[in-house]
Each structure stands twice: as structure tokens, then as C-alpha cells.
């Protein structure tokens, strides 16, 4: 979901005594935020090999200022063929129907600012926004080795095993 609570205590470091923050952040933002809070730099090498930079961004600034913009304006999702793209308050999603060609699936569009429960599909009202988000999802999917899509039947790993030589070079 897009509204998952997170409780953070920063001691007396919050000028307004805490409160609710509504900026979009993602689970990938937790490591950079924790490192930022404790003042530790991310390692750049391990065992002589480069360590990939974390995908997220620290959101410590929003802890001190409720009006700070999100440090994570967009995020793609994919799990077992279900897909989604979040960008600046908009969410495009498609829920996978088993044994249905991926090309026949219909994306939904939701305005998370006005409709955080995603109860109103606005795809017919804003088709250009759907096209924009689907295109952004496809770019992110290609850049992050999401293809080929599968339905959770592990076909992807049969075609590209996770233990192949390309992944062995990175420090884990």
C-alpha cells in the first residue's frame, strides 16, 4: 500500500514534537535515513569490490520540517506480474490476472492526494497521465532488469538465474 505507518523517534530533535508527515517515501529510503541520523557514511567498497549505492534517499529533512518536499518523487513496483508506478502523487497500477496476456491488461490511475484509498479509477479521465506513468514504469523496468515478467512461477530465474556471473561481481 501507499499508506504504511512508520514511527520514528528522534529524541528532542523534532521541533514540533513529532507529528504526521505525508511526504511519499519508500522502504529503500530507510537505510540512507538511518545512516544520516546516526552520522555514518555508507561503505563504498567491501572486500576490495565496489558496493552499489543505496537506491533510496534520506528523509531526515522532513522530520524537522513538515513542509519539506519528498526526497522520493517516483517509484516503480513489480511483484509476480502485478505492476505499479508512483510519481508525484499519482499511481498507475495493473493487477495481474492469471493466464491473461500481459498486453491485454488495463492500467488503473489514482490520485493519491485526493483519493489515498485508491477507490476512484481515473484512467478514463486522464489517459495521458496513464500513458506517461506506464512509459515511466517500462523505462524503470528495463533499467532494473524486471523483464521478462512472470506470474510468480519462477520462469524469470530459469531464463536468467540469480547466481549468474553478472551478479557475482557485486559485493553482497
Predicted regions and their residues:
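Active-site proximal loops enriched in glycine and acidic residues that flank catalytic Cys/His/Asp
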Residues: 8-10, 94-96, 126
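Active-site-proximal N-terminal segment of extracellular/periplasmic enzymes that hydrolyze or transfer
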Residues: 120-128
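Histidine-centered active-site microenvironments of extracellular/periplasmic hydrolases
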Residues: 1-14, 26, 168-169
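Extracellular/periplasmic ectodomains of large secreted or surface enzymes and adhesion receptors
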Residues: 131, 156-172
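Intrinsically disordered, low-complexity polar regions and short flexible loop motifs
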Residues: 115
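C-terminal cap/loop subdomain of S1 sulfatases and analogous C-terminal strand-loop tails that border
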Residues: 14-19, 23, 28-112, 143-147, ...
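A contiguous, mid-protein "functional segment" used to position or interact
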Residues: 127-151
Amino acid at each position: 500500500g501507499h499508506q504504511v505507518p512508520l514511527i520514528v523517534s528522534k529524541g528532542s530533535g523534532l521541533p514540533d514534537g513529532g507529528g504526521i508527515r505525508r511526504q511519499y517515501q519508500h522502504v529503500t529510503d530507510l537505510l540512507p535515513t538511518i545512516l544520516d541520523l546516526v552520522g555514518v557514511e555508507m561503505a563504498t567498497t567491501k572486500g576490495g569490490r565496489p558496493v552499489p549505492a543505496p537506491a533510496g534517499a534520506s528523509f531526515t529533512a522532513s522530520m524537522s520540517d513538515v513542509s519539506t518536499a519528498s526526497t522520493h518523487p517516483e517509484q516503480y513496483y513489480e511483484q509476480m506480474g502485478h505492476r505499479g508506478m508512483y510519481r508525484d502523487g499519482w499511481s498507475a497500477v495493473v493487477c495481474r490476472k492469471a493466464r491473461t496476456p500481459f498486453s491485454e491488461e488495463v492500467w488503473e490511475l489514482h490520485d493519491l492526494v485526493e483519493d489515498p484509498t485508491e477507490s476512484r479509477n481515473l484512467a478514463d479521465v486522464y489517459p495521458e497521465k496513464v500513458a506517461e506513468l506506464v512509459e515511466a514504469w517500462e523505462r524503470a523496468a528495463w533499467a532494473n532488469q524486471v523483464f521478462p515478467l512472470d506470474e510468480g512461477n519462477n520462469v524469470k530465474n530459469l531464463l536468467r538465474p540469480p547466481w549468474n556471473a553478472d551478479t557475482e561481481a557485486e559485493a553482497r
